[in-house]
Amino acid sequence: MKELQTVLKNHFAIEFTDKNLLETAFTHTSYANEHRLLKISHNERLEFLGDAVLQLLISEYLYKKYPKKPEGDLSKLRAMIVREESLAGFARDCQFDQFIKLGKGEEKSGGRNRDTILGDAFEAFLGALLLDKDVAKVKEFIYQVMIPKVEAGEFEMITDYKTHLQELLQVNGDVAIRYQVISETGPAHDKVFDVEVLVEGKSIGQGQGRSKKLAEQEAAKNAVEKGLDSCI
């Protein structure tokens, strides 16, 4: 945990008073289960707490940032920001993936790169930070790590292209729409996916992203921007 403490101190000006709390935040259930005799705590309860404070702070930010957006739009945007895939991305940005304690089986099966484990650890860290410090420190961290990407429009950009494309294509009846990965490049922790969207077997758009879902949205956007004439 010393390396993690160094990362937190150097990059985020965070120093935990309760080191055990920090360690618990990065302990997956699989690790605790493999060391039952040691009665090690895992991070599920902290994840529960972190999820709650994250929802609150992101809701407050969006409410103040977008005074004219209706509740439905705010809810959709919040959902995009706090979804599993997004939180996993933030965890990787913070190098948290390097410090999660996993059981041998989970490690061998690729758990260190699994979005659900990374997202849970990110929320657990927020919960631990809340308990060790206060909500103001959690807010400071969120505004340093998450909000810049929100303000860059990363989450609004991907909100609805797949749905929009589906609505355009299926206005006159059902149409078979399929997304497929063309290629994957880069190391496991920083992959780039190339995806194409096909309608009735015909490729109508391509996109690239750091996850399959982001690449699919880019492919749908590409198809929408081309216009329906090229899609059918």
Curated annotation (Swiss-Prot):
Entry's family note: Belongs to the ribonuclease III family.
Q: Where does Mg(2+) bind?
A: E47, D120, E123
Pinpoint the DRBM domain residues.
160-229
Any stretches that span the bilayer, and where are they?
A: none
Q: Which organism is it from?
A: Streptococcus pneumoniae (strain Taiwan19F-14)
Location of the protein in the cell: Cytoplasm
What is the protein name given in its UniProt record?
Ribonuclease 3
Q: Which CDD domains does the entry link to?
A: DSRM_RNAse_III_family, RIBOc
Q: Cross-referenced Pfam families, in alphabetical order?
A: dsrm, Ribonucleas_3_3
Q: What does this protein do?
A: Digests double-stranded RNA. Involved in the processing of primary rRNA transcript to yield the immediate precursors to the large and small rRNAs (23S and 16S). Processes some mRNAs, and tRNAs when they are encoded in the rRNA operon. Processes pre-crRNA and tracrRNA of type II CRISPR loci if present in the organism.
Q: Name one GO molecular function term.
A: rRNA binding
Identify the residues that the record assigns to the RNase III domain, covering every copy.
5-134
Q: What's an example Gene Ontology biological process for this entry?
A: rRNA processing
Superkingdom, taxonomy of origin: Bacteria
Tell me the disulfide pairings in this chain: none
